Curated annotation (Swiss-Prot):
Free-text function comment from the UniProt entry: Could methylate the ribose at the nucleotide 34 wobble position in tRNA.
The entry's keywords: Cytoplasm, Methyltransferase, S-adenosyl-L-methionine, Transferase, tRNA processing
Keyword Oxidoreductase appears in the UniProt entry: no
Membership in a protein family: Belongs to the class IV-like SAM-binding methyltransferase superfamily. RNA methyltransferase TrmH family. TrmL subfamily.
Major site of localization recorded for this protein: cytoplasm
Gene (UniProt): cspR
Gene Ontology MF annotations: RNA binding; tRNA (5-carboxymethylaminomethyluridine(34)-2'-O)-methyltransferase activity; tRNA (cytidine(34)-2'-O)-methyltransferase activity
Gene3D superfamilies: 3.40.1280.10
Name under which the protein is recorded: Putative tRNA (cytidine(34)-2'-O)-methyltransferase
Length: 160
């Protein structure tokens, strides 16, 4: 039996505190963090370090120069694209196959994912339900919700 691998992918993140908070979630859950360049901040940023606290040594961070580079490196990965344009809620998908690597791909805080990526992958676009008067949820909160939904479906494998 394999351990299910979870991955959070941040496409050109802009806010260091969000990335730091997501890194902390990744450290707590053995989830790999992928950062797609260019980043909107320096990896030496004080807010990034503070949000991640002293857990950075426990985070597996992988840098990519493009989404295409990521897709090429993980051809067998199962990619899900998080967008308010998704037709299905995050709970509609099954994350329990022990032979899969699950990638949750998030867009920039201000503009989301590239439109053509969304249009070409609508069957794998998911959304978090929310009221009409809210434009979006915070990126780090959304990432945590997705990671913990996958872990819930896996009965919180290897977590105490």
């Amino acid at each position: 039996m394999n351990i299910v691998a979870l991955h959070v992918v941040l496409y050109q993140p802009e806010i260091p505190a969000n990335t730091g908070n997501i890194a902390r979630t990744c450290a707590a859950t053995n989830t790999t963090l992928h950062l797609i360049r260019p980043l909107g901040f320096s990896t030496d940023d004080k807010m990034l370090k503070r949000a991640g606290l002293d857990y950075w040594e426990f985070v597996n961070v992988v840098y990519h120069d493009s989404l295409e580079e990521l897709f090429e490196a993980y051809k067998k990965g199962k990619f899900f694209f998080i967008t308010k344009f998704g037709q299905q809620p995050h709970t509609s998908f099954d994350y329990t196959d022990l032979d899969e690597d699950y990638f949750f791909v998030f867009g920039r805080e201000t503009s989301g994912l590239p439109k053509d990526l969304i249009q070409n992958n609508m069957d794998r676009c998911l959304r978090l339900p929310m009221t009409e008067h809210v434009r979006s949820l915070n990126l780090s909160n959304t990432a945590a919700i997705l990671v913990y939904e996958a872990l819930r479906q896996q009965n919180y494998r290897d977590l105490k």
